[in-house]
Amino acid sequence: MNKWVRFSLAFVVLLISLIATAQEQGVVKPQLLLSEIMQGMPKGERQEVRVLTASFKPGDQTVFHTHRFPVTVYILEGAFTLEMEGREPVTVKAGQAMVEPPHVRMTGHNRSSTEPLQVVIFYVSDPDTPFLDRIH
């Protein structure tokens, strides 16, 4: 292949990539953080969507509880450890997310002795369903 043909092909490839890049600038593409197949989602015609926040001081923990529907937790700061009955503890750190399964006895902890923990919680349920059921 002569120089002119190679140069022309290289120029066309460069031009196409520049056009594609220019079209993508300013366009936000969501990045997948977590995907899980879940059972136990609400099946009614209407659902209530709740977004909650929780702040844990070092050493704080939740009450021993269950949820009627899956709960998604996103960690803003610190590390969250979830202990579920019959399962190994799970720890997720800032920038990560996890799904708490329904109908499993659990408690969540900030195991750090120095760092706070902040989380955002997403809960989709039948309307007026309690967020958690405390285990006594």
Q: Locations of the language-model features?
A:
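Boundary at the C-terminal end of the N-terminal hydrophobic targeting segment
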Residues: A20-E24
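Glycine- and acidic-residue-biased ligand/ion/polar-headgroup-sensing regions
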Residues: F69-G86, Q96
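A short glycine-rich, His/Asp/Glu-containing loop-to-beta-strand
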Residues: V28-V63, F122
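Histidine-centered metal-chelating micro-motifs
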Residues: Q61-V63, T81, M98, P102-H109, ...
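Bacterial N-terminal signal peptides that target proteins for export
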Residues: M1-L9
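Ligand-binding loop in jelly-roll beta-barrel domains
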Residues: P89, H103-D128
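Short acidic-glycine-tyrosine-enriched beta hairpin
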Residues: F56, G86-H103
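Bacterial N-terminal signal peptides
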Residues: S8-S17
